[in-house]
């Protein structure tokens, strides 16, 4: 039963991460899996589950605070292109994404679909 609960939790983490950020699902899944595994191990060893939960919540707050301190706004077309190029692993795709974002604006939506045509 615990394995099923853990699997459902990890699935939910991946879905929520994808919905909110659109990226990072692998990292979130690995972290969630480690938290579940270590949490169950600690509970089996006698740790208080509520104490573990509170500790995890405090750690999440601290990590979030630290990440937000180091975060930088991506504002210019060049910054968008550079960030997108890193994510895509391809500068030309980064440039295309920056161009599309420039055209639709901050509130616009860009839909990317896989092509079935060779070379496109």
Swiss-Prot record:
GO terms for molecular function: ATP binding; ATP-dependent protein folding chaperone; isomerase activity. It catalyses: ATP + H2O + a folded polypeptide = ADP + phosphate + an unfolded polypeptide. The keyword Isomerase applies. It comes from the Bacteria. It holds the Pfam family Cpn60_TCP1. It is found in: Cytoplasm. It is an enzyme of class 5 (isomerase). The keyword Cytoplasm applies. InterPro entries: Cpn60/GroEL (IPR001844), Cpn60/GroEL/TCP-1 (IPR002423), GROEL-like_equatorial_sf (IPR027413), TCP-1-like_intermed_sf (IPR027410). Changing residue 78 to D: In strain: 85-961. ATP binds at residues 23-27. GO terms for cellular component: cytoplasm. Keywords: ATP-binding, Chaperone, Cytoplasm, Isomerase, Nucleotide-binding, Stress response. Changing residue 70 to S: In strain: 85-961. GO terms for biological process: protein refolding. Gene3D superfamilies: GroEL-like equatorial domain (1.10.560.10), TCP-1-like chaperonin intermediate domain (3.30.260.10). Together with its co-chaperonin GroES, plays an essential role in assisting protein folding. The GroEL-GroES system forms a nano-cage that allows encapsulation of the non-native substrate proteins and provides a physical environment optimized to promote and accelerate protein folding. Forms a cylinder of 14 subunits composed of two heptameric rings stacked back-to-back. Interacts with the co-chaperonin GroES. This is Chaperonin GroEL. It comes from Mycobacterium kansasii.
């Amino acid at each position: 039963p615990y394995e099923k609960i853990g699997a459902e939790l990890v699935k939910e983490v991946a879905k929520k991460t994808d919905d909110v950020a659109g990226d990072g699902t692998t990292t979130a899944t690995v972290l969630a899996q480690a938290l579940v595994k270590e949490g169950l191990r600690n509970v089996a060893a006698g740790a208080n589950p509520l104490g573990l939960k509170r500790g995890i919540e405090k750690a999440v707050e601290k990590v979030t605070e630290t990440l937000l301190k180091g975060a930088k706004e991506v504002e210019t077309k060049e910054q968008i292109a550079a960030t997108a190029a890193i994510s895509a692993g391809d500068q030309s795709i980064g440039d295309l994404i920056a161009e599309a974002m420039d055209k639709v604006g901050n509130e616009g939506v860009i839909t990317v679909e896989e092509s079935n045509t060779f070379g496109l």
